[in-house]
Structures are given as structure tokens and as C-alpha cells.
Swiss-Prot record:
One of its GO terms (molecular function) is ATP binding. Residues 12-64 form the ABC transporter domain. Belongs to the ABC transporter superfamily. Outer membrane lipopolysaccharide export (TC 1.B.42) family. It is found in: Cytoplasm; Cell inner membrane. The keyword Transcription regulation does not apply. InterPro entries: ABC_AA/LPS_Transport (IPR051120), ABC_transporter-like_ATP-bd (IPR003439), BCA_ABC_TP_C (IPR032823), P-loop_NTPase (IPR027417). It is a peripheral membrane protein. Pfam families: ABC_tran (PF00005), BCA_ABC_TP_C (PF12399). Part of the ABC transporter complex LptBFG involved in the translocation of lipopolysaccharide (LPS) from the inner membrane to the outer membrane. Probably responsible for energy coupling to the transport system. This is Lipopolysaccharide export system ATP-binding protein LptB.
């Protein structure tokens, strides 16, 4: 917050209190970072990034080293960021969790776009299975997934513009655009449901 020259001391304090409340981290405000759980650490990292009022945020492996409940919390935070009009770029090896929050995916291999579509389309693509996922990968609930030891990374690039409409652009390996929320009477419908575009 010290970098926010547009805010005086009281303004910075108000932003701090607002972020602590928004991310449910008021109770850990005086704790050392090493004493936080993985999920608490992720929420603090995201709140810190939002203190600068960004238009775009990078989440580097947000699903790594956190328990399943925290994974759900992080997904909700990602949907919350999108609803606030903040673009999100995610790099993560957790294919299951990342595909679960996307609407459209682009797979690029050796600098060439080899597939695009929703999660089911990507998972059914034989070339994607051959070069990236393997033939055992499944996205069904309760299925134990095999995570392949590769240097590949997932990338989510999301550009928000004009009333929740998304524009997609392929980056290095896999670009995912998050689900678009439906606007109902000026408020967003629940982001955890697949909805038609606005």
C-alpha cells in the first residue's frame, strides 16, 4: 500500500481493512508468513497484489501445496477477481483444477496451436492426449488423476472488456478463459455454474 501515492495514510488504512475483511484474513493480520497454512498464504498473496489496484493479476501455481478446501476457496477467489473486472493469468501444473475453472482452452505445442475448446473437447482430443495429457488423464469427479512430470505449464490469460465479454489469446502452452458470469438485474449469477455469454 505504500506505493499507492493516490492514497493518504487514512486511505491506505481503509484499503487494508477492506482487503483483510474481503479475504477473511483479519484474524491472521499479525502472524508471521511461515506460520500460515497454504490457503491462508494464498489469500494473503492475492490481497497483497490487489492492494495496488491492478487491472491484471498473475497467480503462479495457486493450487500447489494447499488442501482441497483451500483449492475450492482459491477457485472462488478467482471467480471473485473476474467479477471485479480483474484479468487473471495463472501458471499451474494442476491440470484438473485449472481446467475445472475454464470455459475455453487453447493447447499449443512446439509453437503451434493444436486444439481449442471446452474442457471436454480438450480431453477428447487425441493429439492433446498424445503430446500433453497422456491417455489415462480424466477430469471426472472422484477419479484419481495422474500428473505427468513435464516442464509444461498451464497459462490462463483473460482479457476483460465491455460488460463481462471475454477476448481470448493463446500464450505458450495452454490458455484458459474463465467462465463468464451472467448479469442478472445488474448482479452476477453464481460463477460456479456454466452460463451462456452475457
Amino acid at each position: 500500500l505504500e506505493t499507492r501515492k493516490d492514497l493518504d495514510r487514512d486511505g491506505r488504512r481503509k484499503v487494508l481493512e477492506s482487503l483483510l475483511q474481503e479475504f477473511h484474513i483479519s484474524h491472521i493480520r499479525d502472524n508471521l508468513g511461515m506460520s500460515l497454512s497454504g490457503g491462508e498464504r494464498r489469500r494473503v498473496e492475492i490481497a497483497r497484489a490487489l492492494a495496488t489496484a491492478p487491472k491484471f493479476i498473475l497467480l503462479d501455481e495457486p493450487f500447489a501445496g494447499v488442501d482441497p478446501i483451500s483449492v475450492g476457496d482459491i477457485k472462488q477467489i478467482i471467480h471473485h477477481l473476474k467479477a471485479k473486472g480483474i484479468g487473471v493469468l495463472i501458471t499451474d501444473h494442476n491440470v484438473r483444477e485449472t481446467l475445472d475453472i475454464c470455459e475455453t482452452a487453447y493447447i499449443v505445442n512446439d509453437g503451434r496451436l493444436i486444439a481449442e475448446g471446452d474442457a471436454e473437447t480438450i480431453l477428447a482430443n487425441e493429439l492433446v492426449k498424445e503430446v500433453y495429457l497422456g491417455h489415462e488423464f480424466r477430469l471426472x469427479p472422484g477419479t484419481r488423476l495422474k500428473y505427468w512430470q513435464t516442464a509444461l505449464k498451464l497459462r490462463v490469460k483473460l482479457l476483460l472488456y465491455s460488460r463481462q465479454t471475454l477476448q481470448f489469446k493463446a500464450x505458450n502452452l495452454l490458455d484458459l478463459a474463465l467462465r463468464r458470469p451472467r448479469v442478472v438485474d445488474g448482479a452476477c449469477a453464481p460463477a460456479n455454474k456454466v452460463l451462456s455469454p452475457c
